């Protein structure tokens, strides 16, 4: 359990202080307006500043992999300010890519003066050197860019590489740095060493990430100055294209116009100009990461002791009064009920904030965590309707890179196209190869759907697939029966059916309609045979055949059908993931709830990103099932109405399964008329869950915070990442209630509060991360507000729904400063990395 500060802000004011915004700030004609035209310049308050240099923020993209398409990389390359091209001194092939990469960058940017530095990495492997220092220097001089040699392992020249690049870049307060290079050259290692002073031998090359770090660099010209006449001109062009007049400068410009955090936060100095208001936000936020369930905590013998008055559990903060040899009285810190004659031995008294009780042992047939994951089932449920034959233009960035690799110079030969189904056909075989290495015994099933549903397994390779058509598509019970007839022992393993499945996928062709509902039900029935199984649906259209059909039909029957499918999946701990194709419509407002309520992922992506998205699903496995979480606050506090019914101090949340990226937050406040004054506020979270080995446990997490009526005290030294995550999730919850204007106001107020609290480098980094998320929500919210005003039938389309879903489930890695990021998830395995590097993308 985490809190942004050490305090609970208590106020008895019936009228909460307001934040005011002008009509201009709330304009629906732009998505780049922020709360104030001028933001604080943090260069004077950098915690890393030692009296020299300028504080700047580096926004660094780690371009995972090689040529695989990524919308994130596309955006960064187009809007990047400067580029680091990395090769490995023990790999001549990676060195030979340097010139191609530089040409590629210049063609995309349409400039020949892009700030670039060449980095020769792995100088700790001098004995294996294939590229001499002289040869690399000569190439750098011929390309008119600086060259530096580094070792991510020993941290040699790591900072200097980034600082040199920034010094060669037109002056700004935020720099988008793009790190590029061939596979295995150490791009990730360089970035992590720079951010966290840490080295990991093997990184998973498929995980793309961005990092923010505020640093102090000497030798920078003043803002508005230029390196030379030519770069000054290019700087103007770059700033315009990257949106610097929007988000970035607005965060960090206006040096002397912003009051101190204490002044900004004080109720007496709140700006009351404006026509639109919302309640001022507070730092009364609670957060809990489900990743903690995979961490060991002290095991308490015996049964837990419940308060007879409110069902809170005895904790280390409870005041036990000894009344006999092993007898105690406990006056509950929550409800003040006096619990008497409590019999406890010393080992039964909790002595840590987090403790655990075993509720039941696993059955003798239970297996280990790893084997349960490996023995589970994954069903790829693929849309092969006619619309999957629609072609999409390959983004010019991707085409440019392919041409660069081929050594093609000059103008592109013209746009190239790829169908949605072809993207699927190139994505899933790669994933099957990966599963064959990671989980060779995992069962893999291919289900396709058009106007009929087909089930492919190796056992039916002779007779052909099982075909479901006609009236069967309307029969719920028969569809379940067909799915469960595919018994577990008949299902092929990833390693044993790799060639068969890849051949079938390659032979798929688009035909006719979209029987998504029946295909989903059959897939869920197959998956129900093993806990921790998952279904991956890839579709581009609204269901229009069989059960669950939506197109041109009443929604009631379809909603009822998908609710039944959801219950089936929940009962069997199955996760359902939905991947939609951008530019299509699948009605996530109805279908998406199946994924949301089974803790799956909902994603709308470019067809070329299918491989990346499908792979990501296996990189975040479940860690617990049957989770019931009770959050208990003191009776004088109440939970925000979007997290519980109005006015409650306790809320219970249930999850069929959770993973390590499930981070929960809630907002709370003091009641308008508190019944008592409390100096120390207790908090407790009770989590009943089942481990992957079958053990049923109860984890009790307790905490205490000091009360304060002073707003400034309550926000001092705030953990910005917790506030950012909580406010982002809250805005998404509000938007999902179709209160789009209130959601936008909430984000505006959050920006105002968080910005006023920033002092340290880490706080500024995390504020920047929050602003990136806020900007991502801004356009969808404006679209929904306009649609609602115009009385459009569906104010939120699939694109907006997907953004709100993503933001509701945003986790710490999105908002934490670079130094706090958990890089353990970046560790890779040599065999898997080799398999990925051998893939050739087109």
From Swiss-Prot:
Region named Disordered: 253-274
UniProt keyword annotation of GTP-binding present: yes
Pfam families per record: Ras (PF00071)
Record's keyword terms, sorted: GTP-binding, Nucleotide-binding
Disulfide bond positions: none
Positions of the VWFA domain: 377-627
GO biological process: endoplasmic reticulum to Golgi vesicle-mediated transport; intracellular protein transport; signal transduction
Protein name in UniProt: Circularly permutated Ras protein 1
Organism annotation: Dictyostelium discoideum
Lineage: Eukaryota, Amoebozoa, Evosea, Eumycetozoa, Dictyostelia
């Amino acid at each position: 359990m985490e809190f942004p500060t050490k305090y609970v802000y208590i106020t008895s004011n019936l009228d909460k202080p307001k934040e005011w915004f002008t009509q201009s700030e709330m304009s629906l004609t732009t998505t780049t307006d922020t709360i104030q035209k001028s933001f604080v310049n943090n260069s004077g308050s950098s915690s890393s500043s030692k009296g020299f240099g300028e504080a700047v923020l580096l926004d660094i993209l780690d371009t995972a992999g090689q040529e695989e398409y990524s919308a994130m990389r596309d955006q960064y390359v187009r809007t990047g300010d400067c580029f680091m091209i990395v090769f490995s001194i023990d790999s001549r092939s990676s060195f030979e890519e340097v010139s191609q990469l530089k040409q590629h960058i210049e063609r995309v940017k349409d400039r020949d003066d892009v700030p670039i530095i060449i980095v020769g990495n792995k100088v700790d492997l001098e004995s294996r050197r294939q590229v001499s220092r002289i040869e690399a220097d000569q190439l750098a001089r011929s390309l008119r860019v600086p060259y530096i040699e580094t070792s991510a392992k020993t941290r040699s020249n790591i900072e200097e590489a980034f600082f040199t690049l920034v010094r060669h870049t037109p002056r700004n307060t935020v720099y988008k740095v793009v790190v590029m290079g061939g596979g295995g050259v150490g791009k990730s290692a360089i970035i992590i060493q720079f951010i966290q002073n840490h080295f990991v031998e093997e990184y998973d090359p498929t995980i793309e990430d961005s990092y923010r770090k505020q640093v102090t660099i000497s030798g920078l010209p003043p803002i508005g100055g230029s390196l030379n006449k030519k770069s000054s001109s290019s700087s103007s062009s770059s700033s315009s294209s990257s949106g610097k007049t929007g988000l970035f400068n607005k965060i960090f410009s206006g040096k002397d116009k912003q009051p101190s955090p204490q002044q900004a936060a004080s109720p007496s100095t709140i700006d009351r100009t404006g026509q639109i208001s919302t309640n001022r936000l507070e730092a009364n936020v609670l957060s809990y990461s489900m990743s903690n369930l995979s961490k060991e905590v002290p095991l308490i013998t015996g049964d837990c002791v419940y308060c007879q008055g409110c069902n809170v559990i005895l904790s280390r903060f409870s005041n036990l009064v000894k009344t006999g040899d092993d007898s105690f009285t406990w006056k509950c810190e929550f409800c003040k009920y006096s619990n008497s004659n409590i019999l406890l031995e010393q080992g039964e008294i909790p002595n840590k904030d987090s403790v655990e009780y075993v509720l039941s042992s696993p059955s003798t047939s239970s297996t280990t965590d790893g084997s349960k994951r490996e023995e589970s089932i994954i069903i790829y449920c693929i849309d092969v309707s006619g619309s999957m034959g629609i072609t999409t233009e390959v983004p010019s960035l991707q085409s440019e890179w392919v041409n660069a690799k081929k050594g093609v110079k000059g103008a592109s030969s013209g746009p190239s196209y790829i169908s949605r189904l072809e993207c699927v056909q190139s994505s899933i075989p790669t994933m099957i190869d990966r599963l064959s290495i990671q989980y060779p015994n995992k069962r893999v099933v291919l289900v396709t759907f058009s106007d009929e549903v087909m089930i492919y397994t190796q056992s039916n390779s002779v007779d052909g697939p099982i075909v479901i058509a006609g009236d069967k598509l309307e029969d719920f019970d028969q569809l379940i029966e067909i799915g469960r007839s595919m018994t577990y022992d008949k299902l092929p393993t990833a390693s044993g059916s790799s060639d068969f499945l890849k051949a079938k996928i390659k032979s798929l062709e688009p035909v006719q309609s979209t029987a998504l509902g029946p295909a989903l039900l059959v897939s869920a029935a197959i998956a129900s045979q093993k806990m921790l199984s998952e279904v991956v649906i890839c579709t581009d259209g609204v269901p229009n055949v069989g059960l669950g059909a939506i197109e041109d039909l009443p929604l009631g029957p379809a909603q009822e059908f998908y609710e039944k499918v959801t219950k089936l999946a929940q009962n069997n701990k199955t996760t359902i993931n939905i991947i939609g194709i951008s530019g299509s419509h699948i009605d996530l407002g109805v279908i998406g709830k199946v994924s949301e309520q089974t803790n799956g992922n909902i994603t709308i992506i470019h067809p070329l990103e299918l491989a990346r998205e499908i792979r990501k699903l296996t990189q975040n496995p479940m860690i617990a099932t049957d989770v019931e979480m009770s959050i208990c606050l003191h009776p004088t506090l109440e939970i925000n109405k979007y997290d519980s019914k109005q006015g409650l101090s306790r809320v219970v949340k249930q999850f069929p399964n959770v993973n390590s990226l499930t981070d929960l937050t809630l907002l709370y406040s003091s009641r308008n008329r508190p019944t008592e004054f409390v100096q120390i506020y207790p908090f407790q979270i009770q989590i009943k869950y089942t481990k992957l080995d079958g053990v049923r446990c109860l984890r009790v997490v307790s905490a205490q915070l000091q009360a304060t009526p002073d707003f400034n005290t309550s926000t001092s030294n705030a953990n910005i990442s917790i506030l950012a995550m909580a406010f982002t999730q809250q805005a998404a919850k509000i938007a999902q209630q179709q209160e789009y204007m209130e959601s936008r106001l909430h984000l505006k107020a959050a920006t105002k509060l968080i910005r006023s609290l920033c002092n340290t480098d880490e706080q500024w980094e995390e504020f920047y991360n929050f602003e990136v998320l806020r900007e991502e929500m801004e356009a969808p919210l404006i679209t929904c507000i306009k649609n609602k005003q115009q009385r459009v039938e569906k104010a939120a389309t699939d694109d907006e729904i997907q953004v709100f879903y993503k933001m509701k489930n945003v986790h710490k890695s999105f908002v934490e400063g670079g130094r706090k990021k958990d890089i353990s998830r970046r560790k890779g395995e040599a065999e898997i990395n080799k398999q990925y590097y051998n893939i050739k993308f087109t």
